[in-house]
Amino acid sequence: MEPAAAGPGPLIVNNKQPQPPPPPPPATAQPPPGAPRAAGGLLPGGKAREFNRNQRKDSEGYSESPDLEFEYADTDKWAAELAELYSYTEGPEFLMNRKCFEEDFRIHVSDKKWTELDTNQHRTHAMRLLDGLEVTAREKRLKVARAILYVAQGTFGECSSEAEVQFWMRYNIFLLLEVGTFNALVELLNMEIDNSAACSSAVRKPAISLADSTDLRVLLNIMYLIVETVHQDCDGDKAEWRTMRQTFRAELGSPLYNNEPFAIMLFGMVTKFCSGHAPHFPMKKVLLLLWKTVLCTLGGFEELQSMKAEKRTLLGLPPLPEDSIKVIRNMRAASPPASASDLIEQQQKRGRREHKALIKQDNLDAFNERDPYKADDSREEEEENDDDSSLEGEAFPLERDEVMPPPLQHPQTDRLTCPKGLPWAPKVREKDIEMFLESSRSKFIGYTLGSDTNTVVGLPRPIHESIKTLKQHKYTSIAEVQAQMEEEYLRSPLSGGEEEVEQVPAETLYQGLLPSLPQYMIALLKILLAAAPTSKAKTDSINILADVLPEEMPTTVLQSMKLGVDVNRHKEVIVKAISAVLLLLLKHFKLNHIYQFEYMAQHLVFANCIPLILKFFNQNIMSYITAKNSISVLDYPHCVVNELPELTAESLEAGDNNQFCWRNLFSCINLLRILNKLTKWKHSRTMMLVVFKSAPILKRALKVKQAMMQLYVLKLLKVQTKYLGRQWRKSNMKTMSAIYQKVRHRLNDDWAYGNDLDARPWDFQAEECALRANIERFNARRYDRTHSNPDFLPVDNCLQSVLGQRVDLPEDFQMNYDLWLEREVFSKPISWEELLQ
């Protein structure tokens, strides 16, 4: 499902006869024109099949899969984040950077190494390099930029270990920041973005390669290293470094660059790339820099949690019932392995299943579990009878958590022991209490009292107890308070006073994004679609491989295998960056103001984000999470410190020893969280999950034995269980039990039954249009000053102020100014005494 290319328009689905979207092409991704053939494309048939098999191991025997020791965080380890910046094709450029630095360095310092100089000498040379960026000759400027990049990379030629490289890298980057390198690079980047000659040359080229983006890649590399390193807080940092970090974060989020935050410039690069005007832009580096810029300026998930607690205190709301980050970290997803008797029983059931007669059932009860998006892996047998009995012989990861045997011994950590009982405190909204009271009053008394939640006269004692329990667990969200305040501002614009909008980084960023936010969302989703492993390349799809393909295509089997790994890794990093950017923006906007979040979320929905994420998960997700698309000996900084061994097919296939790929699991969790954000409390969007038949796709994702990922999958299943029919619920009791155990409860939510279906007709357009009207009113009131009602605008009564205003006069008036003076001023008598009184 491709993101909408034109302006936003609601996705209209017929309520009576839901039609799934047309199935996209098979999930075997083909590179765009000019791209290399797939990994192993030059291999003999058997070898290619074996290589591909090692790349994506089949996860059908998932009962043997171990628990994934994965801890979710804002980013991966620093070394891993640095390594993912460079593609393996860029390897030879490390030595080129070193050569450019040493040629210039030897002119000024002949007898010492960089690591032997003192701080003043370092600063002097850094400023000298900075001056070199101002030359007009492109080649000279590029050489100086490469020399600066070598300094930012830790002057690795003088280091003997990876730790030493990282030490000097951190020192050098704070030095470069101190002399003002980042601002100079922003100006150069702006110049390169507007370089029309490079853009028109790239548009005309049939196949774009690494060479077309050299200048941009060097600049983006330095900027990424600065942002990523300064953002990392280390215990041994000097006091001045900590001060510089705070100043840098503030500047990065302020509208200092063309009167807009730096992130807006990067968003502009993304849209320019997607429009086809700049196909040479190195999109992976742009997206990584965009992600780290947003993370650095707005803050990560733990910072967000503390900001949320502060805001609740400010609004006079009670504290959060628990710290969700800690609760999720303490959740377990392990399960006992399948016993031999279970396996025999499963085989017998499969044998019996073949002789079952087909039973005609109601549409949703039968709920055909075949996907609208058919992937290549062999899942027909699994989907023919999608009930939990088909998983009996497998180690279903959510079954009987409390009787789980102890996991393998690991080093002691500071994790809290998980308390007995349910992990989450239940929540109740004010609206839920009102609905409960209304139904109770109409049932027992025969009349209603509107939104009165205190009067319980005439209601039986058990109802009193129920209301007391509901009120004990009442939870008022920040979003509800913000929506109520917005209603007040609109209801009484004069008496309500002027709203004080705090210029926090999220507010500044939203103001910058607001004019073109729909285009930014469409562009990000287009790139996500092109990078998804289930996508098939089309002639009109964008080429995201411009900064990974070499000038000359591989000629040997080994080069082809290396490039295949590089291309897959490149796509995975892009998915990781986009998913992280979208999630961070959604969470920060939701905290800053609910209608900022709703504006972004609605444009994601209009651009088909929901089916796109479902399409992403319609693959062998266990294979995606355990994919080994990395060559550890070629990762930075390992490749610049150690002598490179001779690459062989075996060393390429070996990958690392991790049981999962951190970036892929991180991406999957982010995408599930985005899907949760988009559908939460939105009936029409929940029905989209049902219409797109997401249940079987999500159920397969439960095979990944990681607690956080399972939690968000179960949340998505919970919101749609009431619409899947009784038969589905009956045959998926283990999933229902898992939802009960893992997901937060709403005390009067009838999620497991579906008794209120008749009262909730599905009208996508009406719901989205009502929400859109609220969003537009909010944006117009707060940001659209030009179209405000003139009666409500303040009036300037000061004579000096009015006379001091500059008025633009039309040209014809200026030419005939003498005539106007004669007719309107000199020819009319003026009573100066009256005028001056």
Curated annotation (Swiss-Prot):
The segment annotated Disordered runs over 1-67, 333-423
Q: Which InterPro entries match?
A: Far11/STRP, Far11/STRP_C, Far11/STRP_N
Question: A single GO CC term, please?
Answer: nucleus
Q: Which gene encodes it?
A: Strip1
Reply yes or no: does the keyword RNA-binding apply: no
Q: Which GO terms describe its molecular function?
A: protein kinase binding; protein-macromolecule adaptor activity; small GTPase binding
What this protein is called in its record is Striatin-interacting protein 1
Swiss-Prot/TrEMBL GO biological process terms: cortical actin cytoskeleton organization; negative regulation of hippo signaling; regulation of cell morphogenesis
Q: Which Pfam families match?
A: DUF3402, N1221
Biased composition (Acidic residues) is annotated at 378-391
**Signal peptide range in chain numbering:** none
Per the record, residues carrying N-acetylmethionine are: M1
Species in which this protein is naturally found:
Mus musculus
Q: Which family does it belong to?
A: Belongs to the STRIP family.
Keywords for the protein's UniProt record, in alphabetical order: Acetylation, Cytoplasm, Phosphoprotein
Region annotated Required for STRIPAK core complex formation, chain positions: 796-837
Subunit description: Part of the core of STRIPAK complexes composed of PP2A catalytic and scaffolding subunits, the striatins (PP2A regulatory subunits), the striatin-associated proteins MOB4, STRIP1 and STRIP2, PDCD10 and members of the STE20 kinases, such as STK24 and STK26. The STRIPAK complex can be extended by adapter proteins such as SLMAP:SIKE1, CTTNBP2 or CTTNBP2NL. Interacts with CDC42BPB. Interacts with CTTNBP2NL.
Domain of life, source organism: Eukaryota
Q: What does this protein do?
A: Plays a role in the regulation of cell morphology and cytoskeletal organization. Required in the cortical actin filament dynamics and cell shape. Part of the striatin-interacting phosphatase and kinase (STRIPAK) complexes. STRIPAK complexes have critical roles in protein (de)phosphorylation and are regulators of multiple signaling pathways including Hippo, MAPK, nuclear receptor and cytoskeleton remodeling. Different types of STRIPAK complexes are involved in a variety of biological processes such as cell growth, differentiation, apoptosis, metabolism and immune regulation.
Q: Ranges of Pro residues compositional bias?
A: 18-35
Localization (cell): Cytoplasm
Query: Which residue ranges have biased composition labelled Basic and acidic residues?
Result: 47-60, 356-377
Question: Residue positions of the PTM Phosphoserine?
Answer: S59, S335, S339, S788
